[in-house]
Amino acid sequence: MVSIIEVTDKAQLRRFVDYPNELYKDVPQFVPATYGDDLSDWDRSKNPAFEYCDARCWLAMRNGEIVGRIGAIHSRKANDKWGANRLRFTQVDFIDDPEVSSALFRTVEAWAKELDCTAVHGPLGFTDMDREGMLVEGFDRRSCFFTYYNYPYYIDHMAALGYAKDVDWIEELITVPEDEATIQRWEKISDFVLKRHRLHIHEARNRLSYLPLLKPFFELVNLAYAPLYGTVDLSDRQIKKYSAKFAPLINPNTTCFVMDENDRMVAFGVGAPSLASALQKHRGRLMPTGWIDVLKAFHRNDTVDLLLIAVHPDYQKKGVNAIILSKAMKGCHKLGIKQAETGPMLELNDKVQSQWKDFQTEQHKRRRCFIKQL
């Protein structure tokens, strides 16, 4: 017998957040989210998204043990933007038992009907900066620290529950060129584009010098990502929140902010050495000692995670991405990085995918947003 309990206190929330560590404890491909970030996302006093969202989360219990979890988010801002009253499901995990998955989704769908929603879709977060998409290909590959991992049986459960594909994201593994001729060729292209469009790269020796750029960075995120599935503009409070979250991840060697002649940001690329091993070792916890291994990962690593990349609409199709890629290539070469892993890219987003066409790549993962009409 499965019982569903709503998470209403901090002790239950800690169990909700920590459950994936138990479910995937023997799975080397699973990488936990940072524990503190997951906790704060559900805290109304710390997450500005609650200004326009309602959210609830539940645990599935059997014989006193957790056998599943699920969250749900009603984003009025997203529904207004996209013209559809939908409920998002998020952070869903469960054992391979249809009774459990059915009980979890029935609970979410019941709330959706109370809200007069026409559909349930996900997994999606409060914003596009959160984890999203259920893994449907690439189960043998280790996740990035900012993406979900799930068992293959989830797909069958979703189909049995009446959920179908809405959109897919793909991820690429890119081999970093090591030959000097390729690096120099990209540097020449970068120099040409910089001169032609009177642009320059914001040079910085450390993370602190990037801090004043984080607000215009997220303002450009709002502009460039606006047409993408499920996105909503980040508010000033959210920009402040995500700036604090992103600042420690910025590595000057693998980060590029491109500015125009008036020092306005026109493009960016942010990469960070992979934190997967460090977070696995400490179950997503930075304290008391997890932060030490995170710092080590920044200095000794063979993989860089490409977190975000975008170009202002006025500068698209002008070769500006070559500036970002050239700097990233040189930075990876300096750090001994052998491969780069992209974040999820919408499968129909040709603008983003086309920038990897000159590199040796492997599409190694695919994740999906499911939807069910009510």
Protein language model regions, located:
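Extreme N-terminal starter segment of soluble prokaryotic enzymes
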Residues: 2-3
